[in-house]
Amino acid sequence: MALRLILGFDYGTKQIGVAVGQVITGQARELCTLKAQNGIPDWNQVEALIKEWKPDAVVVGLPLNMDGTPSDMCLRAEKFARRLNGRYNIPFYTHDERLTTFEAKGERRDRGGQKGSYRDNPVDAIAAALLLQGWLDENTALFES
């Protein structure tokens, strides 16, 4: 199956950033931020996104430690990816998301966004777009099948 449209998720315990990427353009953009309670999203909201966008695959960011080893959150992010696959029968991929939140804060600042607290002005969707863009850039061979 050729991949055309992909949703990217920046998994977190309080918020989950969502981005959409198109293989034909090789571009990702932020979509929205979902609330989560202890890492559990409102699955109805997730399902609505899946039905609306009809992705061919999903990419979930892995918050690796700076030395490349898995962080405690990696297990939870991988579990979230498996749940997406189990609920919606969509192939999933994972991608190193180190420093995407830091980079997203800088991008928001460069766009003239508020410099307020992270809680008041989250950057999760920007981080999701950055990790999905990284995945798109590194996996062009998958798009040719």
From Swiss-Prot:
Where is the protein found, in the record's own terms? Answer: Cytoplasm
Q: Which SUPFAM superfamilies match?
A: Ribonuclease H-like (SSF53098)
Give the matching InterPro entries: RNaseH-like_sf, YqgF, YqgF/RNaseH-like_dom, YqgF/RNaseH-like_dom_sf
Q: Which GO terms describe its cellular component?
A: cytosol
**Class in the EC hierarchy, top level:** hydrolase
Q: Which GO terms describe its biological process?
A: rRNA 5'-end processing
Q: One short Pfam family name for this protein?
A: RuvX
What keywords were assigned to this record? Answer: Cytoplasm, Hydrolase, Nuclease, Ribosome biogenesis
Q: Name one GO molecular function term.
A: nuclease activity
Q: What is its EC number?
A: 3.1.-.-
Q: Does the keyword 4Fe-4S apply?
A: no
Entry's family note? Belongs to the YqgF nuclease family.
Biological role stated in the UniProt entry = Could be a nuclease involved in processing of the 5'-end of pre-16S rRNA.
User: What name appears for this protein in its UniProt entry?
Assistant: Putative pre-16S rRNA nuclease
